[in-house]
């Protein structure tokens, strides 16, 4: 019985562990990083579970432009649980209409599933659809994932 106590405490503390930010997107840095105004302070958000092409990489600017068209200047909701080693909030971003932006970017072929860290079971399904439909970066015969591209540089 004692071995279940930490699990029960974790489950009941879950709502406390996650938080939301509601704010206007003041900057789109790339296809997976935005800045949101939260209480008069810009907060950097890294979209969790996805990895978009780097700006200098093939499809990088296109991915950034896609993100801009979705959220730039708009009020979004960010649900998050933690920060990364750079201090960015790792968050799930929702557009004003409730659309899951992280999932949209993968579905459009504007980002990869960050498989090493992914916790969203829907994303691999969306990525397979995008690949089969040759959407976005999947129109390339052999797209290079950003984590490999960064390693080569």
From Swiss-Prot:
Molecular function (GO) terms for this protein are: endonuclease activity; nucleic acid binding
Q: Which InterPro entries does the UniProt entry name for this protein?
A: SNase_OB-fold_sf, Staphylococal_nuclease_OB-fold, Thermonucl_AS
The record's EC number reads: 3.1.-.-
How far does the signal peptide extend, from start to end residue? 1-19
Active site: which residues? Answer: 46, 54, 88
Entry keyword set: Endonuclease, Hydrolase, Nuclease, Plasmid, Signal
- Please name the top-level EC class of this enzyme: hydrolase
UniProt lists the family membership as follows: Belongs to the thermonuclease family.
| The name this protein goes by in its record | Uncharacterized endonuclease
Q: Which organism is it from?
A: Escherichia coli
Lineage from the top down? Bacteria, Pseudomonadati, Pseudomonadota, Gammaproteobacteria, Enterobacterales
